[in-house]
């Protein structure tokens, strides 16, 4: 044998012609083999491997594929015990989205201080179902919450699409990208694991929760407890705030001895904001009946639906919430919200419902 050449891309080209991303991956693979060889030969027992910005020059799919393997937990792997510890420092939500929750450490500037603090999730006791839910939840889009200066948790896509627009129209300085605020939809009403993730015992990232009142008798998520279970809450939303969210935000000393009403009253001071009905209904009641009618007409050719929204535009007081929400759901809440946001932007008016204004004021104060 006179020459030995390592080929890549199915043998089409040599290593010298590799892209920077491919070269980085090859280098890491060779380093891993080297460390394993040293252990096998008894020259080393353990290796501590630090990788700075591993996402460099790799497209998103490869980032997730490669580092899912690097970051796998002992339980997920049938391989023998690891002979190395890996530290990744990253700005990539793709890498963050495949990291086990218990392995995450977030470094952030301490509010009002001139130093950096590290927050780890290793000490937060999530039950197995909540942990798995969170790891599934934190996809590439939501993975940005690890890098956020502030987070607003909402129930669905309608709020996620509309909130940045409503905030900017309310106050031009409320540019979420400039402020580092992420709006994260939890896709339901089970806020508890996410409150624990972001709260004082978790990452301690400033956050607010926006949730619906959902009066008794309305169709709501099956994640919610029935208000009649304890005979106290007037709605699913009130029960959700007190029994599911606030118990994770108040200290045991502050929680003990408090009545349901006292805890509910304290919610806004902890960044939890409840509307009067549901997001779409509250937004409609902020003098936006014409914008809602224009949105429906732009998304569907259903004449009866057009007539209903024309009637609402002429007299908003005749609103039937059930039919109203049914019509919006028929075209898709997310699609409706995106079109409505563009109409709001074209109009340029401040149409922010009061509970959202309160949440925005809360976030501004936290990030000041």
Residue spans for each PLM region:
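Acidic, divalent-metal-binding catalytic cores of TOPRIM
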Residues: 99, 105-368
């Amino acid at each position: 044998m006179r020459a030995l050449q390592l080929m890549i891309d199915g043998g089409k080209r040599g290593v010298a012609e590799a892209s920077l991303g491919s070269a980085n991956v090859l280098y890491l693979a060779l380093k891993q083999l080297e460390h394993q060889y040293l252990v096998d030969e008894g020259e080393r027992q353990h290796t501590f491997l630090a990788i700075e910005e591993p996402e460099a020059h790799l497209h998103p799919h490869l980032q997730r594929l490669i580092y899912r393997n690097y970051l796998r937990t002992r339980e997920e792997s049938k391989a023998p015990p690891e002979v190395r510890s890996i530290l990744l420092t990253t700005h990539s939500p793709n890498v963050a989205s495949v990291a086990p929750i218990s392995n995450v450490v977030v470094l952030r500037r301490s509010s009002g201080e001139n130093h950096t603090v590290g927050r780890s999730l290793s000490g937060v006791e999530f039950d197995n179902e909540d942990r798995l839910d969170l790891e599934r939840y934190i996809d590439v889009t939501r993975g940005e919450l690890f890098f956020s200066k502030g987070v607003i948790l909402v129930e669905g896509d309608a709020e996620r699409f509309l909130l940045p627009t409503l905030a900017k129209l309310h106050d031009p300085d409320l540019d979420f990208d400039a402020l580092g605020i992420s709006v994260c939809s939890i896709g339901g009403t089970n806020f508890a694991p996410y409150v624990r993730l972001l709260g004082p015992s978790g990452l301690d990232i400033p956050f607010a929760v926006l949730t619906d009142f959902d009066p008794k008798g309305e169709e709501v998520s099956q994640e919610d407890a029935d208000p009649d279970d304890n005979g106290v809450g007037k709605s699913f939303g009130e029960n959700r705030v007190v029994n599911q969210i606030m118990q994770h935000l108040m200290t045991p000393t502050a929680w003990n001895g408090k009545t349901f009403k006292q805890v509910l009253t304290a919610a806004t001071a902890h960044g939890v904001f409840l509307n009067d009905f549901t997001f779409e209904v509250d937004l409609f009641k902020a003098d936006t009946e014409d914008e809602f009618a224009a949105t429906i007409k732009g998304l569907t050719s259903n004449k009866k639906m057009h007539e209903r929204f024309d009637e609402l535009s002429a007299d908003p007081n005749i609103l039937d919430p059930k039919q109203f929400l049914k019509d919006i759901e028929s075209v898709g809440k997310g699609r409706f919200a995106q079109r409505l946001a563009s109409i709001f932007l074209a109009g340029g008016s401040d149409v922010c419902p009061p509970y959202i204004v309160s949440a925005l004021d809360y976030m501004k104060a936290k990030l000041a």
